[in-house]
Amino acid sequence: MSPLALIVLLAWHATAFKSTDTIEVIPLPHTSGFYYQPINRMQFVEDVWHFIIEVDHGVIFQELDELYRDTLHLLNHTRSSKFVSANCTTNAIIESEINTYILKRILYLVQQHNTIDDKIKANAEGDAPDSRWELNTKDPLAPRRKRGVLNFVGTVDKFLFGVMDSNDARELHDLAKTSNALNEQIKEVTDELVNIAKFEEHKQCLERQRDDLCGYATAKMALITEQLTQLDLLYTNLDRAVDDALDNRINSLIMTPQRLYEEMTNVTVHVPTKLTWPVPLKKTNMHDLINDKIVKTHVFKLERRKLIFILEVPLIDDQNYDVYQVIPIPLCGGDGKCAVIVPDSKYLGVSTNKRNYVRLEDDAPKACKMTSKNLLCFKPKVVHVSSEATLCDIKILLHYENSYENVQRDCDVRVGKFDPEIFHLISDYNNWLYVLQRDTELTMDCADASSASNVIRIAAGTGIIRGRNVTRSCNLMTKSKQLALHQLKNSLFSVSAVPLSTSFNLSAALGDLDRLEIESMKNNADLDHKHLQGATQRLIDLRKRMNNNSVFHGAELEGEASDGWFCWLVGWLNIKCATAEAVVACVVLFLVALLLFRIYRFCCPGTCSAMFSCCRFDALSSVPRRRNKTKSSVIRVNSQLQYLDGGGGGEKSHEETPMVMFNNRARDPNVVFKNI
């Protein structure tokens, strides 16, 4: 082996990849109840400032219509006898280019103009949906009265700048109000978007050279081509700007960072007290507002096909909040049985002065906008006072826990079975909260490194595993778990540790954990608060059962487990277990009654009717009859209908007892039997 190769080999061994250089293990007290992972600093959006940019793209169409007329005029000019007699060599070329390119391109731009309009939601009081722009010889825009430099709408801090008339200003003000309920400030940015170069001097120069027929036609053709190229570019840029606005992106045609900085600087004096811009007012910060989509963009279409782009710049409160992810830490005993406090929300925001706190939705970090430093979120409906906090997760964070007797009252303590190895991802990348019920070996496996020397032994308990200075993609493996380490170009999060409360000790409030009997259920490996609610049992219910000596064994435990399964199933439908059991009982009783009724109808139909008829006949026989008045009736004898006749034809009957005639075809209908 050469000396150079030996030196390289020694250097490689000296810089060998070691797991201890990459993996950091930070033990945490396993009795603390919660781990509070810092997410970021947060501020609430209190209001919105609207910048309104009006684009009158009808001006472009006017230029296109005028160019169309000039092209037709030049085509007629080349076909005139005077021009033909001049015998210009470019005559055929000009006529061919007009027919094959110029006119077709103009018609295509007309179609593109209407396509841009069709993309945008029209105003209810604007043009009809089926109205289209067409080339004609008249001015497509009716003359409109322009308003002055200032035209106040509402209060002085809501005036609009620009060249629109009063009707448009009022309509835009109402439109901005409906697009965001927090709207209080509106400013229109002067329209400088559609700048069409004027060729008046060039046209006048051409008219002076009109006597030179061949030179005039060539120069006129070059001017038309240049104008068409410019209009084509304007339509392309405007189409991209509309598409970007519909996708909530700001196109440079609408607003550049420099222009946004100037407009925000001009209206800063009108920003309400205690509100400020989401970023410090510097030119370098304007890119963050535009590129990170902090500024929202809308586009609308007004009457006469005018387009307005509305930019919403949030105004934030000066109060800052620290956002934490609340992760429950199970306190485990024997046989995988653990107690855990289920938090009321996944995220908590605490003001920097600790006086207020808020509860955030589970998707708050994704729903909020991220600036270079802070999260921007819309304020929730309720902002709580810290001194009046009653729930366990916020009291532990604020060090408000006073006694262990209140744990059962203020905390949603649950008991369940957990996996012996739990690794819960935090901070997105290369950070895990671990809960281990036994000593565990963690092996680092990298593609170009030996795993024999990359073994980390972690004692049973709770802590944080953090990957630092990860220069390659590796895997951390135990006997049952695998964690992926990612190589990051930069740190997406500034990780900071929060000192946990040392005064709170969950084990002091759960001295009877080993005595609690729980139902046999699947082990938990997820520490999400919503998952824990359905996969564990309440401590208060277990203690009531234990105090009532309701400890079940064997078959009783299986029956209880079946009830628990039913309650767990209906719990997914947000139905109380008692209500569901009552409904099931009513359905069962109804089915039993229906079954008995069907058996009666099949086996002994008419039994009840016969019994009722007998009772009624006996009652009637005991009542004295009127001799001078008889009445016919029908009775059932031996399951057949019989006619009861006490006389006939209204004549007086000499029989004191009724006569019975059987309605039977086999008998002689003239035979009458007495009822003795």
UniProtKB/Swiss-Prot annotation:
Signal peptide: 1-16
Glycosylated residues, chain numbering: 76, 87, 266, 469, 505, 548, 628
Record's bilayer topology term: Single-pass membrane protein
Pfam family, one: Baculo_F
Keywords, in A-Z order: Coiled coil, Fusion of virus membrane with host endosomal membrane, Fusion of virus membrane with host membrane, Glycoprotein, Host cell membrane, Host membrane, Membrane, Signal, Transmembrane, Transmembrane helix, Viral envelope protein, Viral penetration into host cytoplasm, Virion, Virus entry into host cell
Assigned GO CC terms: host cell plasma membrane; membrane; viral envelope; virion membrane
Locations listed in the record: Virion membrane; Host cell membrane
Coiled coil (UniProt feature): 169-215
UniProt keyword Ribosomal protein present: no
Example of a GO biological process term: symbiont entry into host cell
TM helices/strands, residue ranges: 577-597
PTM statement from Swiss-Prot or TrEMBL: N-glycosylated.
Claim: Hydrolase is one of the keywords in the record: no
InterPro entries: Envelope_fusion-like (IPR022048)
Function as written in the Swiss-Prot or TrEMBL entry: Envelope glycoprotein which mediates the fusion of viral and host endosomal membranes leading to virus entry into the host cell.
Name of the protein: Envelope fusion protein
Organism, as annotated: Lymantria dispar multicapsid nuclear polyhedrosis virus (LdMNPV)
Top-level taxonomy: Viruses, Viruses incertae sedis, Naldaviricetes, Lefavirales, Baculoviridae
